[in-house]
Amino acid sequence: MHTKMLKGASMGAKRKIEIRKVSRLGIWITLFLALAFVFLIIQGENEFFAMNESTEQYIQGEKAAQQLEKGADYLTEQVRMYVMTGDTSYMDAYFVEANQVKSRENALDTFKIYFDRTASFSALKAALDTSLELMTTEYCAMRLVCEANDVLPSSWPDEIKAAELSKEDEELSDDEKIKKAQHLVTEESYQEMKDIIAEEVTNCEAKLIRQTRHYQEKAMTIFSSMYSKLQIGIVLMV
């Protein structure tokens, strides 16, 4: 009987040891899963914030693209008003925008912060380059009107002073110079370049949408994957 009691005590001790081992293993598994949960939650928050950031960047990029186009349109409006009316306040407003406000250049700089070396940036830069190229025609148009209206050369902006007219244009009468100036900023070739600016801005916006959507879809895929892992972990703990 004494031997049976010893065997029973021995078996009870072994069971306690096994229970302790199982308990310790359970604790380690629980700790591991808890750490995994924390990691996944942090990573999930990072992806969520990254997705929000990409949305904010898209908004800023969209605003910049629109600002550039509005800046180019404003210059066109001012030069057209000047050659139509001869009111130098429009020419002054043109050069305040071009040399001081610089809406177009600032817009591209803002866009570059978020989207440098991307297809959307290249498209927006092409729009600015076309707008800058168009200014050569606008300078000539304003020079013609300045000469026709006997505006004092000393008051001309440097860009107008530097604008070169052809010999034929120099020999035009005052009325002919005004008509030529009006033609320069309304003719088909001028409008075609304006259309190119609009097309490049639209192209930029389309690429921006695709780029942002791709990034958001990628973030959502990662986020969904982590959510699934969390669900599996919860099931394992239960």
Region spans (language model):
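Juxtamembrane segments at transmembrane-helix boundaries
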Residues: 6-15, 81, 140-144, 238
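Seven-transmembrane-like multi-pass membrane architecture, highlighting hydrophobic TM helices
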Residues: 20-26, 39, 81, 196, ...
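Heptad-repeat alpha-helical coiled-coil/4-helix-bundle sensor or tether segments in soluble regions
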Residues: 88-184, 188
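N-terminal alpha-helical signal peptides/signal-anchor transmembrane segments
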Residues: 57-83, 101-105, 124-127, 131-134, ...
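Selective detector of the "anchor" transmembrane alpha-helix that sits immediately C-terminal
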Residues: 228-238
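Juxtamembrane amphipathic/coiled-coil helical coupling segments that flank
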Residues: 12-16, 42-55, 145-148, 156, ...
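Positive-inside N-terminal membrane-insertion signal
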Residues: 1-31, 224-227
